[in-house]
Amino acid sequence: MEEIKLKIINIGILAHVDAGKTTLTESLLYSSGRIKELGSVDSGTTKTDTMFLERQRGITIQTAITSFQRENVKVNIVDTPGHMDFLADVYRSLSVLDGAILLISAKDGVQSQTRILFHALRKMNIPIIFFINKIDQNGINLPDVYQDIKDKLSDDIIIKQTVNLNLKPYVIDYTEPEQWETVIVGNDYLLEKYTIGKTLNIAELEKEENERIQSCSLYPVYHGSAKNNIGIKQLIEVITSKLFSPTQLNSDKLCGNVFKVEYSDDGQRLVYVRLYSGTLHLRDSVNISEKEKIKVTEMYTSINGELRQIDKAEPGEIIILKNELLKLNNVLGDKKRLPHREILENPLPMLQTTIEPCKSVQREKLLDALFEISDSDPLLQYYVDTVTHEIVLSFLGEVQMEVTCTLIQEKYHIEIETRKPTVIYMERPLKKSEFTIDIEVPPNPFWASIGLSVTPLPLGSGIQYESLVSLGYLNQSFQNAVMEGIRYGCEQGLYGWKLTDCKICFKYGLYYSPVSTPADFRMLAPIVLEQAFRKSGTELLEPYLSFEIYVPQEYLSRAYNDASKYCANILNTKLKGNEVILIGEIPARCIQEYRNSLTFFTNGRSVCLTELKGYQVTNIKSAFQPRRPNNRIDKVRHMFNKINLH
């Protein structure tokens, strides 16, 4: 008997906080027959909220994956986070989707987070269905919600389904002329037929509608109540129809992408992979780089929130591997065959704090927990300060910090203490400078001579390195050692922060054979680099955000006048409907206070969209961070610093 090949579709459910995305996932599983009873966010019995903290707070933090099947179509549901600080996780999840359901609460309308998610989906060309949830609440006016979507998201919507007074959903067909006009706008052939009075057949309209939805130029609107299972069967029908097409390649060559890493309660490392082409079998050896392979020893897929072991995976499938080598964004197989899709850059951590266990005996356990958490979330980084021995934690936003701390307490059972977060600064040289330290010239104890120059570069350039010393004069091992020393030296500038936006040139090098070793060059290079920066001086840079602020017109004056109070620079203004859009930039350290102020005086009617712009010169006069010591070079550093002070 011939095996029926499943069509696999990966969809994402995205929404602002409390719009009901986890409840919708439960309802989809229930209506498709995958689960026998509906879980509840309030009671903590949902299938996809796996972390204790998620159940406690009623919001989805990690990306949970489950699936259901209708006839010969399998749908993997990626239930994505809804909190601002977790957009990095959202963006990673978006890259594996064939389509998205964007939830909008009928009561709350389009929220700030809804706009951010819609912008991200459009930027990555992912087809979208709008699902208006909670229509069974009192005081709902659907035409107002439609207008809200048009004003704040897109005019290109088509109402495909609504409800009658008894809350029984029905599907709108193509009998209404306005439905025809919405579908055929932009298609000259169909528009001409319609204009001259020729009949448009349903097949033509459906084909044009599907093509426009796939090209992200039309967005169908559906309605319902996930909590009370209203409109869910119709949503399942449209998901499993021709609306979403699998993003996969016609190739036998294997290609898959790692988009998520997590740890199970018993400490097993789980790696999530989306397959785009080829078939992966148990015990296959797979390339993950030019020099590295992994062997597939265990392979799972998620069904009803549970892991099920499988022997093979087909294109389109999301699989889970137990593997210690795979990292986020690794490609399994042929990297060239990965579908092109614009990847939104993950922002850099902008804040840091210290974190310590209340009981010193739990310090090692805390470090182990941080290792697991940071492995799952690259936006969370940590290190142990070698001066104070404190654990320094860097992160994107305060909600991320709060969730991380609660996770450490609830999952790992470690009571912790933290300090108030501070901004992560960077440094850039003020002018071009050079410095040389010669061999056998005190206080240089190393058998090496190094001459370096540093030149400031425009903001956002990063570190550039060039060697003017030929390999014929100084061999590769010495040259590599100089680069390693410079890389180490760039970790700490004059204020103790990382250096950036400069060109470092290796201009002169000398060694004595046979006494000189690469270690001599490795130790001397950061000392020479520091002296060059002392000659040039450095300036502090801080993270800036670009923003779009939407405020009702009556609050424009207040929002504009408050900008300078929070160090914001408004670059442009636009009028859209009853709102004014303020476009500008602001230091990351000020955005939360400005956002809170906007929310307060507009009574929650403002929207603030932000993206990391990069680092810019700060007006903060000084912000020192203690240097991390190095016993092998610090004595020499201090001697050169003392000499060059005079």
From Swiss-Prot:
Belongs to the TRAFAC class translation factor GTPase superfamily. Classic translation factor GTPase family. TetM/TetO subfamily. GO terms for biological process: response to antibiotic; ribosome disassembly; translation. InterPro entries: EF-G-like_DII (IPR053905), EFG_II (IPR041095), EFG_III/V (IPR035647), EFG_V-like (IPR000640), G_TR_CS (IPR031157), P-loop_NTPase (IPR027417), Ribosomal_Su5_D2-typ_SF (IPR020568), Ribsml_uS5_D2-typ_fold_subgr (IPR014721). PANTHER family: RIBOSOME-RELEASING FACTOR 2, MITOCHONDRIAL (PTHR43261:SF1), TRANSLATION ELONGATION FACTOR G-RELATED (PTHR43261). The keyword GTP-binding applies. Transmembrane segments: none annotated. It comes from Lactococcus lactis subsp. lactis. The keyword GTP-binding applies. Abolishes the inhibitory effect of tetracyclin on protein synthesis by a non-covalent modification of the ribosomes. The gene is tetS. GTP binds at residues 15-22, 79-83, 133-136. CDD domains: Tet_C, Tet_II, Tet_III, Tet_like_IV, TetM_like. NCBIfam families: small_GTP (TIGR00231), tet_protect (NF012153), tet_protect_M_W (NF033148). Keywords: Antibiotic resistance, GTP-binding, Nucleotide-binding, Plasmid, Protein biosynthesis. Residues 6-247 form the tr-type G domain. This is Tetracycline resistance protein TetS. One of its GO terms (molecular function) is GTPase activity.
